[in-house]
Swiss-Prot record:
It comes from Pseudomonas syringae pv. tomato (strain ATCC BAA-871 / DC3000). This is Ribosomal RNA small subunit methyltransferase A. The keyword Methyltransferase applies. PROSITE patterns: RRNA_A_DIMETH, SAM_RNA_A_N6_MT. Specifically dimethylates two adjacent adenosines (A1518 and A1519) in the loop of a conserved hairpin near the 3'-end of 16S rRNA in the 30S particle. May play a critical role in biogenesis of 30S subunits. Keywords: Cytoplasm, Methyltransferase, RNA-binding, rRNA processing, S-adenosyl-L-methionine, Transferase.
């Protein structure tokens, strides 16, 4: 980077810039971008992945919040015809403005860890536009996404991500791959939205409500955590044992509870 464009990572943006060439290459090989792809990179930072993505020949839109990084990115990539830069907050970005076909967007990002979970929920609201997503995240977050029922990692994030997507924990990345090094390990995850949901709920917003309510007090039984939404009899009628704790239920069971609540709301 030239002296003119020196940039320090900003703590308030959760910035840790990827610089390890071996890790960058491994990520690019996992993505396998092709010229016909439509790519969206969130938080390109100083462009560690951007160059390799552009070299694939694919159309690349990037969304960057930090205004001070805009001239750095433009100086490196603005001359390339397949590069399009959007300065703004990815949490507020309207993905429909990209004009992408359904299930065509391939989303990539070394996501700031302080906004990774809300950003993923924002992306899941646009899952119909997305073909796949490859993210660098805190390792602990990836483990929660990929978790199964019965353990401490299984929770709201696991259930709602797995409702929409197939989850693959690809590989881990140590702190030394970044500048400055974060205090935690990182991991690359691949999320592939389902064309047909394996466990479709009547209303996914009701499912979100049930899951959120259940895990607000995850050490209590379902009949206690859900008592404001469903009676003990209604939980049993859903084919669920009300004496279980939320972490003991799989996705299909939560969908049944949500559908019972949806029917209850309609009849009241």
């Amino acid at each position: 980077m030239t002296e003119q464009f020196q940039h320090r990572a900003r703590k308030r943006f959760g910035q840790n810039f990827l610089h390890d060439a071996g890790v960058i290459d491994k990520i690019l090989r996992a993505i396998r971008a092709k010229p016909e792809d439509r790519l969206l990179e969130i938080g390109p930072g100083q462009g560690a992945l951007t160059e390799g993505l552009l070299n694939s020949g694919a159309q690349l839109d990037v969304v960057e919040l930090d205004k001070d990084l805009i001239p750095i990115l433009n100086s490196q990539f603005a001359s390339q015809p397949n590069f399009n830069l959007h300065q703004g907050d990815a949490l507020k970005f309207d993905f429909n403005t990209l004009g992408a076909e359904p299930r065509s967007l391939r989303v990539v990002g070394n996501l700031p860890y302080n906004i990774s979970t809300p950003l993923i929920f924002h992306l899941l609201q646009n899952a119909s536009l997305i073909r796949d997503m490859h993210f660098m995240l805190q390792k602990e977050v990836v483990e929660r996404m990929a978790a199964g029922p019965g353990g401490g990692d299984w929770g709201r994030l696991s259930i709602m991500v797995q409702y929409h997507c197939r989850v693959e924990h690809l590989f881990n990345v140590g702190p030394g791959a970044f500048n400055p090094p974060p205090k935690v390990d990182s991991a690359i995850v691949r999320l592939v939205p389902y064309e047909t949901l394996p466990h479709p709920a009547k209303d996914h917003r009701v499912l979100e409500r049930v899951v959120r309510e259940a895990f607000n007090q995850r050490r209590k039984t379902l009949r206690n955590t859900l008592k404001l939404l469903l009676s003990s009899d209604e939980i049993t009628a859903s084919g669920v044992d009300g004496s279980l704790r939320p972490e003991q239920l799989d996705l299909a069971a939560f969908v049944r509870l949500a559908d019972t609540l949806s029917e209850k709301v309609l009849t009241e």
